[in-house]
Swiss-Prot record:
<comment type="pathway">
    <text>Xenobiotic degradation.</text>
</comment>
<feature type="active site" description="Charge relay system">
    <location>
        <position position="138"/>
    </location>
</feature>
<feature type="binding site">
    <location>
        <position position="214"/>
    </location>
    <ligand>
        <name>substrate</name>
    </ligand>
</feature>
<feature type="active site" description="Charge relay system">
    <location>
        <position position="214"/>
    </location>
</feature>
<dbReference type="Pfam" id="PF01425">
    <property type="entry name" value="Amidase"/>
</dbReference>
<protein>
    <recommendedName>
        <fullName>Amidase FVEG_08295</fullName>
        <ecNumber>3.5.1.4</ecNumber>
    </recommendedName>
</protein>
<keyword id="KW-0378">Hydrolase</keyword>
<dbReference type="GO" id="GO:0004040">
    <property type="term" value="F:amidase activity"/>
</dbReference>
<dbReference type="InterPro" id="IPR020556">
    <property type="entry name" value="Amidase_CS"/>
</dbReference>
<comment type="function">
    <text>Amidase; part of the Fusarium detoxification of benzoxazolinone cluster 1 (FDB1) involved in the degradation of benzoxazolinones produced by the host plant. Maize, wheat, and rye produce the 2 benzoxazinone phytoanticipins 2,4-dihy-droxy-7-methoxy-1,4-benzoxazin-3-one (DIMBOA) and 2,4-dihydroxy-1,4-benzoxazin-3-one (DIBOA) that, due to their inherent instability once released, spontaneously degrade to the more stable corresponding benzoxazolinones, 6-methoxy-2-benzoxazolinone (MBOA) and 2-benzoxazolinone (BOA), respectively.</text>
</comment>
<comment type="similarity">
    <text>Belongs to the amidase family.</text>
</comment>
<dbReference type="InterPro" id="IPR036928">
    <property type="entry name" value="AS_sf"/>
</dbReference>
<dbReference type="InterPro" id="IPR023631">
    <property type="entry name" value="Amidase_dom"/>
</dbReference>
<feature type="binding site">
    <location>
        <begin position="235"/>
        <end position="238"/>
    </location>
    <ligand>
        <name>substrate</name>
    </ligand>
</feature>
<feature type="active site" description="Acyl-ester intermediate">
    <location>
        <position position="238"/>
    </location>
</feature>
Length: 530
C-alpha cells in the first residue's frame, strides 16, 4: 500500500474549505496579514476596518436575539433568505479573522432558507419555533453530506456523514438553518483550540488569546456575531470555558436531557463514567432556554434511546433568589479579573434584593482526582487512538488534562475500581447535598475558570467546571464585565496581556433541575443588565 501523504491531504482540506467562501466576501491582504496567533489586534476592529458588511447585514447579525429574530421572521418582517445570507457572509468574515470553521455549506443554507420563506408564504405558518434561525454546529455533530474530521489527520480519508445526528434532525424539524461547522482542539479533551488539520482558532477580542475549548469555533463565531446560536458539547467544561472566554452564554444540561446519538464517534458506546452532553451557546440567557425548550418539547427520547423521557416544565420565575456564592478554591485561587467582576456581580445582586449565602465548598482537586480515575478506566481511549492512527503528533496542550498528572504514582486502572469510584462520587455528592440543604439555595454562583481568556497554550486543568460534570449538575455561564489592566493590576499578575478580555461566572443547579437553573440564569442576567 502506498504511503499516505498526510500533509498533502491537510493542504487539500484547507484549500477546499477556503474555496467555499465567495470571492466578494474575502478580506484584503491588508487585513488578513494582521491575523496571527501572536497579534494583539481585536477582530472586532479588523471586521469594522474591512467594511464588507452592509448596514442591514450588521443590523441583522448584531441587533437581535434568537428569540426576537425568529419572531421577526415569523411575521415576515425579515425573510429567512436575507437572514441566512447575512449570517453566512458574517461567518465567512469571522472565520477569516479567527480560523473558526471546518465545514462550509452556505449554498445548502440559502437553498433551505428560500424553501422556508416559500413554506411560510404558502402555509401562513412557520415550520417550528426555530423557523429560519441560523445555527452553527460543533464539528463532531453529523450533518448528512458533510465531513466530521474533528481535526484528526486520520479522519481526512473518512467519507462524509450518510445521515444526520439526532440533534441535527430535531433542530431542522424545528426550522433551523445550518450553514457551517466549527473547529475543535485535537481529541476534544483540552481547553484549547488547536489541531493539526485546521490549525488554531483565535479569540475575537484579542487574537493572541485562546477562545477556550473544546467548543472553540462555536465560541469565536458567537463572540463576533457570526452565529446567533450554536451547539457545543461538554465533558469537563467544553461549553462553559469557551463561553466565558468570548463573552457569550453557555449551558451544560444534565446528561441525556438532550439527544447524543448518531454523532461522530469519540467514546466507547455505553460508556457510563463521566459522560459528555451537548449544550447550547448563545448571546442571551433567554436563547439558551429557547434551545432547550424546543428540543425537549419535541421529545428526544422518541428518536434516541439514551435520551431521558423527562418532559419540559416551565419553571415559575422567582424575582428574588437565594444564591449561594463560592468565590474560589484556595488551592486554585482565581485571578484578579474574575475576583473583581464576581464580587461586583454579587454586590449588584445583593443590592437588587437577592439573598446571598457564602458557601465553603469541598476541594476541587477531590473532584478532579475522581473524574480522572473514571477517564483512566477507558483503556481504549478512542481520541488518542485516532491521533495514533493518523501518525500525527499529539499537541502539547494535552498535557494539562493528562489523567496521570492527578493520579497516585503506580496507580493501575481496572474495572474493580468502578465500585470504588462510584462510592466516592456518592460521597462527594452528599457533601454538596448537605451544603445545598443547609444554605437553602436556588442556585450556586461560582467561577467557571480561574481567569479570563489566557494566551494560547497556557490554560491549565479545568478545576472549576469538572466538579459539575462529575456530579452531573446543570450549569450555565453568564458573561459579566471585562478584564482591566488598571483595575486588575496586582503584584505578580500581568494584567496587560488580558486587558479587555471578557469575564463572567458560572451558575450551578441541582441535577435534573435544568429548567430552574435556566430560570435563575435569566433572572440573574436580567438583574445585572438593569
Amino acid at each position: 500500500m502506498a504511503e499516505v501523504n498526510w500533509q498533502q491531504l491537510i493542504n487539500q482540506k484547507r484549500a477546499t474549505r477556503e474555496a467555499l467562501i465567495p470571492e466578494q466576501w474575502l478580506l484584503p491582504a491588508t487585513i488578513t496579514s494582521k491575523v496571527t496567533p501572536q497579534s494583539t489586534a481585536s477582530a472586532f476592529e479588523l471586521l469594522s476596518e474591512a467594511g464588507l458588511l452592509t448596514e442591514r447585514e450588521i443590523d441583522i447579525t448584531e441587533k437581535y436575539t434568537a428569540v426576537s429574530l425568529t419572531a421577526k421572521i415569523a411575521t415576515g418582517e425579515l425573510s429567512s433568505y436575507d437572514v441566512a445570507t447575512a449570517f453566512c457572509k458574517r461567518a465567512a468574515i469571522v472565520h477569516q479573522l479567527t480560523n473558526s470553521l471546518t465545514e462550509i455549506f452556505f449554498d445548502k443554507a440559502l437553498e433551505r432558507a428560500r424553501w422556508l420563506d416559500e413554506y411560510l408564504s404558502k402555509e401562513g405558518k412557520t415550520v417550528g419555533p426555530l423557523h429560519g434561525l441560523p445555527i452553527t454546529l460543533k464539528d463532531m455533530i453529523h450533518v448528512k453530506g458533510q465531513y466530521s474530521t474533528m481535526g484528526f489527520v486520520g479522519h481526512l480519508r473518512h467519507p462524509p456523514a450518510d445521515e444526520n445526528a439526532v440533534i441535527t434532525d430535531m433542530l431542522e424539524a424545528a426550522g433551523a438553518v445550518f450553514y457551517c461547522k466549527t473547529n475543535v482542539p485535537q481529541t476534544l479533551f483540552v481547553c484549547e483550540s488547536f489541531n493539526n488539520v485546521f490549525g488554531r482558532t483565535l479569540n475575537p477580542y484579542k487574537l493572541c488569546l485562546s477562545p477556550g475549548g473544546s467548543s472553540s469555533g462555536e465560541a469565536a463565531q458567537l463572540g463576533l456575531c457570526g452565529s446567533i446560536m450554536g451547539v457545543g458539547s461538554d465533558i469537563a467544561g467544553s461549553v462553559r470555558v469557551p463561553a466565558i472566554f468570548t463573552g457569550v452564554y453557555g449551558f451544560r444540561p444534565t446528561v441525556n436531557r438532550l439527544p447524543w446519538s448518531k454523532q461522530a464517534e469519540l467514546a466507547l458506546k455505553g460508556w457510563q463514567g463521566v459522560q459528555p452532553t451537548l449544550g447550547p451557546m448563545a448571546r442571551t440567557a433567554q436563547d439558551l432556554t429557547l434551545f432547550m425548550k424546543t428540543i425537549i418539547q419535541a421529545e428526544p427520547w422518541r428518536y434516541d434511546s439514551t435520551a431521558l423521557a423527562i418532559p419540559w416544565h416551565d419553571a415559575p420565575r422567582k424575582d428574588k433568589l437565594t444564591i449561594g456564592v463560592w468565590s474560589q478554591d484556595p488551592q486554585f485561587p482565581v485571578f484578579p479579573p474574575i475576583a473583581r467582576t464576581m464580587a461586583s456581580a454579587v454586590g449588584r445582586l445583593r443590592a437588587a434584593g437577592h439573598t446571598i449565602k457564602i458557601i465553603e465548598a469541598p476541594p476541587t482537586m477531590k473532584a478532579m482526582k475522581i473524574a480522572m480515575r473514571w477517564f483512566a478506566l477507558d483503556q481504549v481511549n478512542l481520541p488518542l487512538k485516532f491521533v495514533q492512527d493518523g501518525a500525527e503528533s499529539p499537541i502539547a496542550d494535552l498535557d494539562a488534562m493528562d489523567p496521570g498528572k492527578f493520579l497516585d504514582p503506580g496507580y493501575v486502572a481496572d474495572l474493580s475500581e468502578n465500585i470504588s469510584i462510584s462510592a466516592d462520587i456518592h460521597d462527594y455528592r452528599e457533601e454538596w447535598a448537605k451544603i445545598w440543604r443547609e444554605a437553602g439555595i436556588d442556585v450556586l454562583l461560582c467561577p467557571a475558570s480561574r481567569g479570563s481568556a489566557v494566551p494560547h497554550g497556557e490554560f491549565g486543568p479545568l478545576m472549576y467546571t469538572i466538579p459539575w460534570n462529575l456530579l452531573d449538575f446543570p450549569s450555565s455561564v453568564v458573561p459579566f464585565g471585562k478584564a482591566d489592566k488598571t483595575l486588575d493590576s496586582k503584584d505578580g499578575y500581568d494584567s496587560t496581556v488580558v486587558d479587555g478580555a471578557p469575564t463572567g461566572f458560572q451558575l450551578v443547579g441541582w441535577r435534573f433541575q435544568d429548567e430552574q437553573t435556566l430560570m435563575a440564569t435569566e433572572v440573574i442576567a436580567d438583574t445585572l443588565k438593569a
